[in-house]
């Protein structure tokens, strides 16, 4: 008996704890334990002593069993002790007992989760097993332990059984309905089409590519794995990162979603909706952080998938850690669906070291996954076997019979099970030269199978001509089987030949009455063959006669207990489009055959071409049962896919075919080798070539790499012959000649191969060998997947090579001895593919994603093609793939047609092609350096109409977000219009039908496969109709909710929107208002735009986005949401934690901060320095409150004007700063910021202000005993204080203030003008000098006298020099992140207050004014006009202008008095005020504002978030806070900028199409009134501002900022300024050795950590300094080196440090 050691127990227990780390709330709950009616009485002596034996392993005992620990004796000890002897039978029974209770003895206090089984026949099937368990328990009780000195005290405990089986049918229905109700609230489950009836539910761990914990839902059609560890489905991590391409690194905008990693060219998605590339998280095998020495670059992530390797470089170490952990975290939230029909085998893996009691599932694609149930593995295994057999149409009751059938299936390599009719031992022979003893089987399908130790014989029913009993045999009667080609097979030594003959004759007579039967040995009648058959027979008569000449070997079969074939341990690399071995594809292939055979081969020949001939009497046709070509849509036959057409005899362990099938055990037996050669295969995906042998069969091209040591020897010999070329390895790629100049290289990561030093060459070569050892895979290329075959020269091989392009990969075979034969054979085999199969495969590619995942491959959506032609007849397969890759379309998209046209955007015309597919309208420009790519989902289109403007024959397409796309110059505009219109209607009808049927028959979505770029020209296909894209009918495993393009924009407001598309038609919004309104009424398909949006809302089904929330989040949101309906069943079943009900209605606002969260860092003393107006201060109040809620001690230092607001109203610590914001505001408004007049007056008036500000900042930080400092650039003192105190420092600002080419500096005089990247960058450099030069003397004097540090003499700021972390409190949707901003810069979103102060409650007369309605209009919502803290030079003139504009617009208005002192002229409003004076509602003494029917003057500050919700339009000065409040309230904005950043915000409002900007210098009443009317009457503006508001409310800027601060705390220190040599002492500051004339040769060296000067001996150490973001080793002094080694992370405030 195998002993269960403590090591294996520890490993198993750890795996179980991993699997149960996130268990369901219903599992092991108190209600289930209290209501359990089951009792499991066991002998606790075994368990307790076993626990005490492994006490060192951390296994705790239950309190109920604590009294038995000292007195009990373990049976395991008895067995292991040499003095204790048990009988063999007792040892075997105890071993069975231990295996059965393995799940319950890890921890005595552990209760396994329940496994729900709803099979009504399950209990009866397990009665015998229950009896066996009870007998084992009784055996344990009666075991004689007299040899043990200590007595055993046996106690019983009552534990809830892990298996939950309903008592009756009613309870069965109730439990099933309860779980179904929970599952129906999960989008991952509802998207599955026809999931079937639920039979089981349990927790498990799934090992597929990576290990995850999941909940397994077992239905009659699927195995559905839902995640246990939930993450926020709306959470998106995005930033600019570098990705390794073919040769260079390129920066992309990376977006991490809950199911994929996608990258785009830029963060502004106004050119395309689809990414440049995508990595499915489900396909990721490993994510590793690479050492800089391996890649030559720091902060690199290596992401390895099934087929490729991607290398990504990040900017900082915190960013690297953040992405690394987020990718691993989101992998735990994936959903995997496995159709039961795709399972090839299910076995129980009980001997594995880590995964005992696991279920090994082998899938059709050759993939394997391990499922480890939390408990009751045997019961789950039995249930899966039953459902699997039922799905295959096989009825198996006895386990022995089931195992025998599985062994039979594996023996004959059948992909589907069969029903055995009878079997008998016999001797098979055809002549005296060979005979085999074995077993003859007959199945209900009529096929005869014979198996022996040396051979396998398969005689299909279609090849049987006659069966007789030979009475003339010498020994006993023999059974003679005649084939249709008149070969005779003898089966002798059958025990009861009469019975066997009667059974098979009865069965065959029913299926094929033409078969001749005789019991007396009568010779069957022979029909004269037809003329063509005679010629065919005579052609091969000299080659083969009889079965002897076509003996085909098969490999030795693996043991039954291990389902994975034991072949050479090299992974298999398949073409992902149709590399699976689909058994349901033989019907169509049997129509047209490729006849092939193989003669006896010489294993020693390196270049063997087997004649492409066959004997039709003996060779199975080319259309094997395992071929991957799908049947045509009309094929509905349910015949077993494992049937053969001709008789096959296969000898084991002989010739090359035996070796071939040993290497590729999953291939069917009839795949014989036609040719094999030694060659080199260049793996294009990995940029590596591998030596090996290529095999060609009738259906596949297979490659097996040679061992790595042989390749190394060959390469070393080549390097010795060519010593000069050893240092440089060729990295030449075969580029696509048709590739555009802007086409990004999507090739996967290749390690660096060039070096200048010999040592680095050795390291690089070693890395290459290591990579090849990891990536060396067998290749299996289905011939039907081939798109093109070319013979050309490739620089890597120097000679000619054969390039094969499939649907998803590129294969290059070189170093071929007989390249012409290899090329011709592949070309000839490719030509033999039946044309009907190609047509069916091309038509099947047009099927929808839901049909791809259905079990039936017969669905076809060819009606999507308007022209009635399939995609293959318009576009060749290679053209189709190239077009989809350039447009970023998914692989299953069906291209319908294309047209030449021009696209009009702004003032630019682009000529190109308009592509129409079944789901999108696409445009791709042809000329120009920068290509224009536009992808418009048909689901977003609300209007298609003809128009003629600047360019003739135009068509305008309008989306739901009111973006207009104009295409013109169509030669046949009517035809284009008709196709677009019909395709649009069909797409919307399909979406509507699928949406309406979602509740009854939910659909499943397939993963969106983004094929890699195929960069190679192809030759003309060899046949008239080339092979087109084949759609795999197998879909295992499938991610049920892959949102690869989760950033795809959908209908405004109604769906989740990830990005806003700006810049499409913003310049023409105002010019085309009247034209748009008129055409909407006359020429549009749907008259009213609002009705269009409503209809699209009802009909559109957007891309699926996961929305499963955690239980904690649901509990927090529950008071704000509608109550979910509870089940009416009486069963006390608690909902599983991960299947929590989804909220139907949620608050549109952002989620609030978590109360009392677990602090990631220690509580810190944080000081925030800021100055400015109320709008500048308020965001930092929100940040301070958030930090305080996290447990930090926050001090906010600002002007004395805001003391009461900060300390009294919000309860924050306050420190005063110098200066009056009113004086600064008045100076800026009167003179303009940073003008010569402004600088002249500022130097005279504000020199004392700067000195006072610097001193008060220093005092505020000292008084607060600051540990972390956050400051705005306007305080000037922030980075200098952070440098002297050596504390973490963060910049924070409300506008972009970092150098970039995307935006100009907001304070620049021309900030509102976009003049290119060089100009924008120059404005930042100019403003840095303008800000620094006037005050540099004061700051340096303050540094030297007060801070005691050297002066800062550089004109480049400290922030730019050291790349300090920067927090920007605005939205990425309004100001997208520029590509040249690194990871230290975070755009967090707006910092808004959760609750405003009570003192800002609105006055009663304002509420009354808002509630009044105009007598002329029913909906006369007022507009808001206010300029906040702007000090206006002439407030009376501005007030009159505003009143006049309000009168012209005919709107009601609220005017805020603000700091500018706006007022209303009483004379202009006498008529409107008479009614109010007569009513006497307001007295003259207490009147705080003037109220009229049209205008209200607001004198008291009111909360903008409350007020803006009540108005229709906001007119403001463009301050950052006011703009944020208006956007959050979803109100259009008119910005009247006065100075500074207000011009920048006005320009951003105008560019995004949510308002406009009118500079104050050119403001007139007429222009203002016209803009008010146009904006309020423009539907597109309302739609865009609603979208923007929805996006902003989803952001949580405060939480994002706090997370960023915590993440960058260890890396936000400012290095101390190096002491100048001129002012340094004349001696080393370490050893004190003088630098005098006697030591003039002694070098002086700066320490990069402390900045002091030392000699070389005192700075001999080098190391990176992470807290200063210095990642390369630099010189440091001995003291600093010791400090860095003792605390390498410099993160003393981290809790877990």
Curated annotation (Swiss-Prot):
Q: Report biased composition (Acidic residues) as residue ranges.
A: 739-749
What residues does Zn(2+) 1 bind to? Answer: 1628, 1631, 1655, 1658
Q: Domain GRAM, which positions?
A: 658-793, 881-948
- Which residues are noted in the entry as Zn(2+) 2-binding? 1647, 1650, 1677, 1680
A single Gene Ontology molecular function, please?
sterol 3-beta-glucosyltransferase activity
Keyword annotations of the record:
Glycosyltransferase, Lipid biosynthesis, Lipid metabolism, Metal-binding, Repeat, Steroid biosynthesis, Steroid metabolism, Sterol biosynthesis, Sterol metabolism, Transferase, Zinc, Zinc-finger
Q: Which Pfam families match?
A: EryCIII-like_C, FYVE, Glyco_transf_28, GRAM, PH
From the UniProt record, list the coiled-coil ranges: none
Q: InterPro entries, from UniProt? A: EryCIII-like_C (IPR010610), Glycosyltransferase_28 (IPR050426), GlycoTrans_28_N (IPR004276), GRAM (IPR004182), PH-like_dom_sf (IPR011993), PH_domain (IPR001849), UDP_glucos_trans (IPR002213), Znf_FYVE (IPR000306)
Q: Per the record's keyword annotation, is Nucleotidyltransferase included, yes or no? A: no
Q: Does the keyword Nuclease apply?
A: no
**What Enzyme Commission number does this protein have?**
2.4.1.173
Task: Cite the record's Low complexity compositional bias ranges.
Answer: 584-628, 711-722, 1026-1047, 1065-1084, 1112-1130, 1469-1479
User: Which reactions appear under catalytic activity for this entry?
Assistant: a sterol + UDP-alpha-D-glucose = a sterol 3-beta-D-glucoside + UDP + H(+)
* Biological process, per Gene Ontology: carbohydrate metabolic process; lipid glycosylation; sterol biosynthetic process; sterol metabolic process
List residues of the PH domain.
234-332
Q: Which family does it belong to?
A: Belongs to the glycosyltransferase 28 family.
Functionally, this protein is described as follows: Involved in the biosynthesis of sterol glucoside. Can use different sterols such as cholesterol, sitosterol, and ergosterol as sugar acceptors.
The protein's matches in PANTHER family, at most eight in alphabetical order, are given as: STEROL 3-BETA-GLUCOSYLTRANSFERASE (PTHR48050:SF25)
Protein name per the record: UDP-sugar-dependent glycosyltransferase 52
Source organism = Dictyostelium discoideum (Social amoeba)
């Amino acid at each position: 008996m195998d002993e269960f050691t403590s090591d294996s127990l520890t490993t198993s227990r750890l795996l179980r704890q991993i699997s149960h780390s996130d268990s369901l709330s219903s599992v092991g709950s108190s209600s289930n334990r209290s209501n359990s009616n089951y009792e499991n009485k066991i002998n606790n002596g075994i368990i307790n002593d076993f626990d005490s034996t492994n006490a060192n392993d951390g296994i705790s005992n239950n309190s109920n069993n604590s009294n038995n620990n000292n007195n009990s004796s373990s049976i395991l000890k008895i067995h292991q002790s040499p003095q204790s002897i048990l009988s063999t039978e007792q040892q075997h029974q105890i071993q069975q007992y231990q295996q059965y209770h393995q799940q319950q003895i890890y921890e005595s206090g552990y209760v396994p989760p329940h496994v729900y089984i709803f099979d009504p026949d399950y209990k009866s099937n397990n009665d015998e097993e229950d009896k066996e368990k009870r007998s084992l328990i009784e055996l344990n009780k009666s075991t004689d332990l007299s040899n043990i000195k200590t007595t055993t005290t046996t106690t019983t405990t009552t534990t809830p059984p892990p298996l939950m089986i309903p008592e009756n049918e009613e309870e069965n229905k109730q439990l099933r309905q309860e779980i179904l109700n929970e599952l129906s609230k999960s989008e991952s489950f509802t998207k599955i089409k026809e999931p079937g009836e639920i039979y089981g539910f349990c927790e498990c761990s799934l090992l597929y590519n990576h290990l995850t914990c999941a909940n397994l839902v077992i239905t009659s059609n699927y195995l559905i794995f839902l995640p246990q560890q939930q993450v926020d489905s709306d959470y998106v991590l995005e930033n600019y990162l570098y990705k390794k391409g073919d040769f260079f690194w390129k920066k992309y905008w990376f977006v991490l979603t809950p199911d994929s990693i996608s990258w785009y060219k830029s963060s502004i998605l106004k050119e395309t909706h689809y990414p440049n590339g995508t990595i499915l998280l489900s396909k990721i095998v490993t994510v590793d952080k690479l050492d800089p020495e391996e890649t030559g670059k720091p902060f690199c992530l290596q992401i390895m998938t099934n087929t490729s390797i991607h290398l990504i470089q990040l900017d900082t170490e915190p960013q690297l850690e953040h992405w690394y952990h987020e990718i691993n975290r989101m992998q735990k939230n994936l959903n995997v669906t496995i159709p039961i029909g795709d399972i090839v085998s299910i076995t129980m893996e009980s001997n594995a070291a880590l995964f005992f009691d696991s279920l090994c599932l082998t899938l059709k694609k050759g993939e394997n996954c391990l499922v480890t149930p939390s408990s009751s593995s045997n019961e789950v295994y039995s249930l899966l076997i039953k459902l699997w057999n039922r799905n295959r149409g096989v009825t198996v009751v006895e386990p022995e019979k089931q195992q025998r059938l599985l062994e039979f299936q594996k023996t004959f390599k059948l992909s589907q099970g069969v029903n055995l009719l009878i079997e008998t031992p016999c001797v098979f022979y055809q002549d005296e030269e060979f005979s085999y003893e074995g077993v003859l089987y007959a199945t209900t399908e009529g096929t005869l199978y014979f198996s022996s130790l040396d051979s396998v014989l398969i005689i299909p029913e279609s090849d049987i001509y006659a069966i007789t009993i030979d009475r003339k045999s010498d020994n006993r009667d023999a059974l003679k089987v005649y084939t249709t080609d008149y070969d005779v097979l003898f089966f002798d030594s059958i025990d009861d030949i009469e019975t066997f003959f009667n059974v098979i004759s009865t069965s065959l007579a029913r299926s094929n009455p033409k078969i001749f039967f005789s019991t007396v040995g009568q010779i069957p009648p022979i029909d004269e063959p037809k003329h063509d058959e005679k010629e065919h027979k005579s052609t091969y008569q000299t080659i083969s006669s009889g079965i002897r000449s076509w003996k085909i070997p098969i490999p030795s079969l693996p043991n039954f207990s291990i389902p994975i074939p034991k072949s050479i341990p090299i992974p298999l690399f398949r073409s992902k489009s149709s590399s699976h071995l689909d058994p349901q594809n033989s019907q169509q292939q049997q129509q047209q055959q490729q006849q092939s055979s193989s003669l006896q081969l010489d294993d020693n020949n390196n270049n063997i071409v087997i004649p492409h001939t066959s004997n039709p009497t003996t060779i199975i046709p080319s259309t094997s049962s395992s071929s991957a070509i799908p049947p045509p849509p009309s094929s509905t036959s349910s015949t077993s896919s494992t049937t053969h057409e001709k008789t096959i005899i296969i000898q084991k362990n002989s010739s090359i075919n035996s070796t071939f099938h040993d290497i590729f055990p999953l291939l069917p037996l009839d795949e014989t080798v036609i040719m094999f050669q030694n060659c080199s295969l260049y793996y294009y995906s990995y940029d590596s070539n591998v030596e090996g042998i290529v095999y060609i069969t009738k259906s596949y091209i297979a490659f097996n790499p040679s061992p790595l040591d042989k390749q190394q020897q060959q390469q070393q010999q080549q390097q010795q012959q060519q010593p000069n070329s050893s240092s440089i390895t060729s990295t030449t790629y075969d580029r696509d000649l048709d590739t555009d100049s802007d086409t990004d290289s999507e090739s996967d990561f290749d390690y660096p191969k060039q070096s200048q030093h010999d040592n680095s060459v050795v390291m690089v070569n070693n890395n290459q060998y290591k990579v090849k050892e990891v990536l060396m895979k067998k290749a299996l290329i289905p011939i039907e997947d081939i798109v093109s075959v070319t013979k050309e020269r490739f620089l890597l091989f120097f000679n000619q090579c054969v390039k094969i392009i499939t649907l998803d990969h590129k294969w290059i075979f070189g170093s071929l001895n007989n390249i012409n034969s290899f090329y011709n054979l592949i070309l000839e085999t490719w030509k033999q593919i039946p044309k009907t199969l190609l047509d069916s495969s091309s038509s099947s590619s047009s099927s929808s994603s839901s049909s791809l995942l259905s079990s039936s491959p017969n669905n076809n959506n060819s009606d999507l093609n308007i022209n009635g032609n399939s995609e293959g007849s318009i576009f060749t397969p290679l053209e189709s793939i190239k077009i989809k890759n350039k447009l970023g379309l998914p692989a299953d998209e069906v291209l319908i047609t294309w047209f030449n046209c021009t696209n009009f955007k702004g003032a630019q015309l682009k000529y190109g092609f308009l592509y129409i597919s079944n789901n999108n309208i696409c445009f791709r420009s042809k000329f120009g350096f920068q290509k224009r790519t536009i992808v418009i989902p048909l689901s977003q289109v609300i209007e298609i109409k003809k128009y003629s403007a600047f360019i003739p024959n135009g068509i305008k397409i309008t989306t739901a977000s009111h973006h207009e796309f104009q295409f013109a110059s169509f030669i046949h505009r009517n035809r284009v219009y008709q196709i677009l219109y019909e395709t649009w209607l069909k797409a919307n009808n399909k979406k509507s039908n699928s949406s309406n049927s979602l509740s009854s028959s939910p659909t499943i979505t397939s993963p969106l496969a983004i094929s890699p770029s195929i960069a190679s020209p192809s030759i003309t296909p060899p046949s008239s109709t080339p092979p087109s894209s084949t759609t795999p009918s197998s879909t295992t495993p499938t991610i049920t909710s892959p949102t690869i393009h989760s950033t795809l924009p959908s209908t405004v407001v109604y769906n989740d929107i990830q990005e806003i598309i700006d810049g499409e038609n913003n310049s023409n919004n105002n010019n085309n208002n009247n034209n748009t309104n008129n055409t909407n009424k006359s020429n549009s398909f749907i008259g009213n735009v609002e009705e269009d949006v409503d209809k699209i809302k009802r009909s559109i089904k957007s891309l699926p986005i996961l929305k499963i929330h955690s239980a904690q989040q649901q509990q927090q949101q529950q008071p704000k949401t509608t109550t979910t309906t509870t089940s009416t069943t009486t069963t006390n079943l608690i909902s599983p934690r991960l299947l929590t009900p989804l909220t139907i209605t949620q608050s549109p606002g952002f989620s609030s901060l978590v109360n009392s969260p677990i602090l990631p860092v220690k509580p810190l003393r944080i000081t925030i320095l800021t100055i400015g107006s109320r709008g500048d201060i308020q965001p930092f109040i929100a940040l301070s409150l958030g930090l305080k809620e996290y447990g930090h001690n926050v001090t906010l230092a600002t002007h004395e004007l805001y003391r009461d607001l900060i300390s009294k109203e919000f309860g924050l610590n306050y420190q005063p700063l110098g200066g009056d914001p009113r004086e600064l505001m008045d100076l800026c408004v009167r003179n303009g910021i940073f003008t010569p007049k402004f600088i002249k007056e500022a130097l005279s008036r504000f020199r004392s202000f700067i000195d006072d500000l610097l001193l008060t900042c220093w005092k505020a930080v000292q008084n607060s005993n600051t540990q972390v400092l956050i400051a705005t650039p306007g305080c000037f003192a922030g980075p200098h204080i952070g440098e002297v105190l050596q504390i973490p420092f963060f910049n924070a600002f409300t506008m972009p203030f970092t150098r970039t080419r995307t935006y100009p500096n907001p304070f620049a005089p021309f900030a509102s003008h976009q003049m290119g990247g060089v100009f924008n960058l120059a404005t930042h450099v100019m403003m840095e000098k303008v800000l620094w030069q006037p005050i540099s003397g004061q700051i340096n004097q303050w540094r030297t006298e007060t801070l005691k540090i050297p002066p800062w003499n550089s004109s480049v700021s400290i922030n730019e020099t050291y790349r300090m972390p920067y927090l920007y409190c605005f939205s990425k949707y309004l100001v997208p992140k520029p590509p040249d901003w690194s990871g230290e810069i975070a755009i967090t979103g707006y910092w808004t207050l959760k609750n405003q102060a009570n003192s800002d409650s609105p006055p009663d007369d304002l509420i009354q004014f808002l509630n009044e309605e105009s007598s002329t209009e029913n909906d006369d919502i007022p507009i808001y006009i206010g300029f906040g803290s702007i000090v206006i030079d002439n407030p009376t003139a501005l007030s009159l202008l505003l009143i006049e504009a309000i009168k012209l617009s005919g709107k009601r208005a609220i005017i805020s008095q603000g700091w500018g002192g706006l007022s209303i002229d009483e004379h202009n409003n006498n008529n409107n005020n008479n009614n109010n004076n007569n009513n006497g509602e307001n007295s003259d003494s207490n009147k705080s504002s003037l109220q009229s029917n049209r205008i209200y003057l607001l004198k008291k500050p009111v909360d903008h978030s409350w007020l803006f919700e009540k108005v229709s339009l906001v007119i403001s000065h463009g301050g950052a806070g006011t703009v944020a409040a208006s956007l959050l309230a979803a109100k259009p904005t008119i910005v009247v900028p006065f100075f500074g950043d207000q011009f920048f915000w006005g320009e951003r409002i105008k560019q995004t199409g949510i308002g406009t900007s009118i500079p104050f210098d050119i403001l007139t009443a007429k222009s203002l009134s016209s803009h008010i009317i146009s904006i309020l009457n423009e539907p597109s503006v309302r739609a865009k501002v609603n979208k923007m508001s929805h996006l902003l409310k989803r952001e949580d800027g405060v939480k994002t900022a706090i997370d960023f601060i915590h993440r960058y705390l260890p890396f936000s220190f400012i290095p101390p300024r190096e002491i100048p040599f001129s002012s340094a002492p004349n001696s080393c500051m370490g050893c004190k050795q003088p630098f005098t004339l006697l030591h003039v040769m002694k070098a002086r060296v700066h320490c990069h950590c402390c900045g002091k000067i030392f000699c070389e001996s005192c700075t001999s150490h080098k190391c990176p300094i992470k807290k200063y973001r210095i990642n390369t080793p630099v010189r440091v002094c001995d003291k600093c080196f010791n400090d860095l080694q003792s605390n390498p992370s410099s993160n003393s405030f981290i809790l877990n440090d």
